[in-house]
Every structure is written in C-alpha cells, then in structure tokens.
C-alpha cells in the first residue's frame, strides 16, 4: 500500500535480473510520463524487456479501467473481481463521425502545401517532417476505409502494425514507398503516392 520504500531505492529491481538499461519516465524532464504511477522501463542482460508501474491502491481501479487489455496476474489480497477478462475493445478502429472525417481530410490536404513549400525551397527536413504528419492522417483514413469494408470490431494493432493484412499488395507497396525520402525526387514521389492513396481511401468511406 505504501510505495515510498520502492521509490527510495532501485536496488529491489535487481531481484528480476541484471539490468543493462533502465528508464524512469517520472524522473525525466525531456520525456514526461503520460500516465499515473511510477514506471520503470527495463532491459535485462538476457534482452528481456519489462515495463513495470507502481501505483497507490486508490489509483489502480482507474488505471485498470483505462485499458481493458490489461490482465491481473496476481491479486493476493482479493481486492478486485476475479472475472475480469482482458479484451482489446479500447483499440478497435473507431468509426468516424462526419466531422472527424472532414477534419482528417482538411488536415491532410492542408499539410500538402507545407510539403510542397519545403520541396520548392530545397528544405528537405521541413518537407519530410510534414510528410510524416500527412502520413499519420493517411493511416487514419486507411484504417477507416478498412473499417467500412470489414467492420469496426477489431484492432489494427499499435502503430497500425497489422494494416498490411487488410490492404491490396500494390497499395501496401505504394504506401511503403512513401518512406523513401533520400532525395528531393523521392520526396515528391512520396507526396504524390500519399495523395493518391488518400484520395482513393477517402472516396470509399
């Protein structure tokens, strides 16, 4: 119930193994934490990675309800219901409202002008950075296209890592080509590919 002894020293972490890399987001200024609690991101010498978070008991219910994919492995004091079944519903593709759809389109096409500006001025990093932002909206639109085709009752995984399983091969290869940004010509081609994919995906939603 009292987390102070754990936070006073990190020595207890050695119980899990020899640590070769440790990050404590709550102690960082450049990368502040996004959630409640005190977390440790650990890599051990056998390359097993452990993400560990310490919470006060009164914060746990809120923490648990924020992500239904979390599973309780041990509840030695029987504080919580035993019938909690993990599920990934929090990560299912979200069906867009008309407003969200319009916002995505507006953001995507507005970003296009910044990519073009960077290319015309020979400012590669400026262009690439805004192309990255465009690609985020493209992925959002592609996920909606997939949702309308297959349903909104499943997840494409973190960072859309399973999206290729629902795309035509030629579309997937075209999407991958947008990451080839090692010349101004390739950045132009990436921009055009993003536009083509977005135009087609948005017309299907």
Regions found by a protein language model. Give the residues of each.
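A short, terminal or domain-edge coil/loop segment
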Residues: 26-39, 78-90, 176-187, 205
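Metal-dependent nucleotidyltransferase catalytic core
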Residues: 1-53
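Acidic, glycine- and histidine-enriched catalytic cores of nucleic acid- and nucleotide-handling enzymes
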Residues: 37-83
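Short, low-complexity, polar/charged sequence segments that are solvent-exposed and flexible
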Residues: 15-20, 61, 70-74, 147
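A short, charged helix-loop
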Residues: 69-103
């Amino acid at each position: 119930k009292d987390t102070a002894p754990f936070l006073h020293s990190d020595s207890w972490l050695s119980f899990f193994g020899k640590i070769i890399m440790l990050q404590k987001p709550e102690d960082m200024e450049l990368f502040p934490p996004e959630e409640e609690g005190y977390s440790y991101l650990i890599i051990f010498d056998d390359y097993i990675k452990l993400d560990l978070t310490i919470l006060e008991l009164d914060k746990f219910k809120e923490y648990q309800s924020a992500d239904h994919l979390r599973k309780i492995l041990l509840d030695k004091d029987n504080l919580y219901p035993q019938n909690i079944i993990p599920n990934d519903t929090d990560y299912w593709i979200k069906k867009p409202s008309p407003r969200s759809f319009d916002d995505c389109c507006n953001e995507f096409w507005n970003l296009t002008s910044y990519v073009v500006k960077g290319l015309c001025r020979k400012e590669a990093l400026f262009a690439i950075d805004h192309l990255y932002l465009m690609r985020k909206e493209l992925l959002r639109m592609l996920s909606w296209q997939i949702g309308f085709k297959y349903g909104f009752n499943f997840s494409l995984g973190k960072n859309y890592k399973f999206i290729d399983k629902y795309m035509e091969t030629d579309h997937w290869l075209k999407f991958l080509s947008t990451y080839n940004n090692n010349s101004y010509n390739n950045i132009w081609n990436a921009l055009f590919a993003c536009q083509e994919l977005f135009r087609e995906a948005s017309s299907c939603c």
